[in-house]
Amino acid sequence: IEAYAEHDGVVGTTDLAGYTTYRIYALCDNEDDFVSAVAGDDEFSTFIHTTTTFFQHEAGGVLGESSNPLIFPFIPEAAYDSWVTIGLDEAADGTSGESGVSILEGLEPWVEPFEAGGSLNIADALGGVWYVLNGAANGVAGEDKRVLLGQFTTDGNMDGQL
């Protein structure tokens, strides 16, 4: 987990004073390691909790690829939306071998509660996942040996398990 931005006031039209934007990465052993999915179920849950709420902006989405850097000069707070991903913080670049991230929900939806600012919980019998297909460039660790899994903005304390 890495503190990406610490906010001390208004960003755009939103007061983010006291909020911190974190980015969570999978740390890999090798540059060519591949992260295909983050999944959870009732035996091995995946969760990212906050003691308050996660900042969600209407111009964002549940996936990092929903972020559009072209709007950030006009709506700067949208850059700090909370989302999940496999290696993307904006739309996939197909010419570079990147592929969009897909989501599956189980019996208990996790996307809608998370998009409403709640904690992310994947812990039911069917499980849930966000994933990319094998070979997508955005799942490859690269020189820094890490793959971005999500961005989370909160003014609370976070804990989690992936």
Residue ranges and their predicted role:
Residues 1-162:
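Non-catalytic macromolecular-recognition regions in eukaryotic signaling proteins
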